[in-house]
Amino acid sequence: MFTQNHFEIFSIDGLEARMAEIRSEIQPVFSEIGQKLLTKLSAKISNQEFYFHIAQHRRRTANAPENTWSAISTKARGYKMEAHFQLGIWEDYVFIYLSMIDQPKKQKEYAELLTNLSVEKMLTEDFIISKDHTKAEVFPLSAFSEAAERLGKVKKSELEIGRLWSKERFDGKEDSKILAEMLETIDQLLPIYQKLMEV
């Protein structure tokens, strides 16, 4: 599980230095938790193969990443072309999202489906959304409908929906509780994910 030390990695100066710590310290935690999420998904959707990915930030040549993430998708060679699950970390929180980023192939179809779903009624109030995977800013679930409409109208728009856990909770005392909440987050998002996979 994540610890306070993992959040401090985002204070390290320099691309190479920060990436070295991300690889050695954060990515093993992604793998540990990610395998549990993968097992949960495979059990719930037994007729589908799922693959675990870790963001490598290979395109970066100067600026160190302000966040990093892992992903679960049905594609062996990538994840951004379809709706997928993400487990990631910023300097002040950890998140799990159902993500549609970087112009997935069925972006318009996803948007049409989501604008007609009563997503706010399908999820508990502690769910939040992100409109840009490169920014830490999040919005309440009440902003979902507007963001879903934008996903269909603006080519470069993005939509992520899920939960976050503030860094203060990662003191080692709540690890099992946080993991249970993460697995339950996948459970709540699954009905939406399954509908997206059908379009």
UniProtKB/Swiss-Prot annotation:
| Annotated disulfide bonds | none
* UniProt name for this protein: UPF0637 protein LACR_1918
Q: Which organism is it from?
A: Lactococcus lactis subsp. cremoris (strain SK11)
Family assignment from sequence similarity? Belongs to the UPF0637 family.
Domain of life from the UniProt record:
Bacteria
Q: What HAMAP family does this protein map onto?
A: UPF0637
